[in-house]
Amino acid sequence: MKRLLFVLIALLAMLQYRLWLGDKSLADSFHLQEQIKLQQQSNAQLVARNQVLREEISDLRSGTEALEERARNELGMVKEGETFFRVVGGERGGVPEN
């Protein structure tokens, strides 16, 4: 009887060790769940970014307005016959003073 009790206690101790400290333990499980959450957040951000890029590609393929806007903003280009004005001033935000 003592031998059976000893075997059961040893088995219980071994199972507890594996549960708390061994490979695939609860700590590892919690760590993996946290990594999954972080990866899902990263994936959601990338999906949103991809959607924006798809829309931009669609705009560039469909018409010249998006291409013209990009050329104006990024390259500083102007149409023939246009005059470019650069307003240099303070950080008032375009609010006129009375």
Swiss-Prot record:
Segments in the Cytoplasmic topological domain: 1-3
Localization (cell): Cell inner membrane
Protein name, UniProt field: Cell division protein FtsB
Function of the molecule: Essential cell division protein. May link together the upstream cell division proteins, which are predominantly cytoplasmic, with the downstream cell division proteins, which are predominantly periplasmic.
Subunit structure: Part of a complex composed of FtsB, FtsL and FtsQ.
HAMAP family: FtsB
InterPro entries: Cell_div_FtsB, FtsL/DivIC
UniProt GO BP: FtsZ-dependent cytokinesis
Primary site of residence: membrane
Keyword check for Signal: no
Topological category with respect to the lipid bilayer: Single-pass type II membrane protein
Family affiliation: Belongs to the FtsB family.
Coiled-coil zones: 31-74
Keyword tags: Cell cycle, Cell division, Cell inner membrane, Cell membrane, Coiled coil, Membrane, Transmembrane, Transmembrane helix
Record carries keyword Coiled coil: yes
Organism: Shewanella pealeana (strain ATCC 700345 / ANG-SQ1)
Ranges in the topological domain labelled Periplasmic: 22-98
